Swiss-Prot record:
It comes from the Bacteria. It comes from Escherichia coli (strain SMS-3-5 / SECEC). This is UPF0246 protein YaaA. GO terms for cellular component: cytosol. InterPro entries: YaaA (IPR005583). One of its GO terms (biological process) is response to hydroperoxide. PANTHER family: PEROXIDE STRESS RESISTANCE PROTEIN YAAA (PTHR30283:SF4), PEROXIDE STRESS RESPONSE PROTEIN YAAA (PTHR30283). Pfam families: H2O2_YaaD (PF03883).
Length: 258
């Protein structure tokens, strides 16, 4: 079983690390090509392209400039510990045991605009390059054209290595669009998280993102290997709703706190 999650915009390169082990990203040659393109952008162009403030644009221009392919534990940190968005709040990788990291390294992948696919312990230098950004490059007009089949092929390699054909899609639509389902040698299961609001169940972005992290943690902590085991997920008040679910979609609901 291979779990897919999105990266985060918020990064943490200060907190203590629970493990000293690391691996290197497998698609760095591609990352270097994107860095070459990104370095051509001025801070105002970055601000416009990414729809971010001038201050953030300056920070990210400096990150592109400082990025270099020799990754060490001094200039980079493990991806699963560097990302700090809502998904990662639910995941809480900083509390993982070494055995948890082992399982995650085999069964969890982070999709990335710059790195393509990251394993949890892959070192990562700080960056901001969302998958949906229209960064022109030698392969096309955006990052989807740049990555082409590369991400899908890398996921197929991971599935083959574990002798499995199930992908748990906990990534956002923006990121999963970089995967080509018809070329993926897998059954795709998508957990959906609905929260009650004024008597109706709907996707509430903040809660849904955190729930994706909670589900990832549930799979890792319990060493789950079959999709039917996911129905036991009950973290923070969620419960499986079989009636609302279908073959490829597992629906989990949570009642409003009154």
């Amino acid at each position: 079983m291979l779990i897919l999650i999105s990266p985060a915009k918020t990064l943490d390169y200060q907190s203590p690390l629970p493990t000293t082990r690391y691996t290197l990203p497998e698609l760095l040659d591609n990352s270097q090509q994107l860095i070459h393109e990104a370095r051509k952008l001025t801070p105002p162009q970055i601000s416009s392209l990414m729809r971010i403030s001038d201050k953030l644009a300056g920070i990210n221009a400096a990150r592109f400039h400082d990025w270099q392919p020799d990754f060490t534990s001094e200039n980079a940190r493990q991806a699963i510990l560097a990302f700090k968005g809502d998904v990662y709040t639910g995941l809480q990788a900083e509390t993982f045991s070494e055995d948890d990291f082992d399982f995650a390294q085999q069964h969890l992948r982070m999709l990335s605009g710059l790195y393509g696919v990251l394993r949890p312990l892959d070192l990562m230098q700080p960056y901001r390059l969302e998958m949906g950004i229209r960064l022109e490059n030698a392969r096309g007009k955006d990052l989807y054209q740049f990555w082409g089949d590369i991400i899908t092929n890398k996921l197929n390699e991971a599935l083959a290595a574990q002798g499995d054909n199930v992908v748990i899609n906990l990534a956002s639509d923006e990121y999963f669009k970089s995967v080509k389902p018809k070329k993926l040698n897998a059954e795709i299961i998508k957990p959906v998280f609905l929260d009650e609001k004024n008597g109706k169940f709907k996707i509430i972005s903040f809660y849904a993102k955190k729930a994706r992290g909670l589900m990832s943690r549930f799979i890792i902590e319990n060493r789950l290997t079959k999709p039917e085991q996911l129905t036991g997920f009950n973290s923070e008040g969620y419960f499986f709703d079989e009636a609302s679910s279908s073959n490829g979609e597992l629906v989990f609901k949570r009642y409003e706190q009154r």
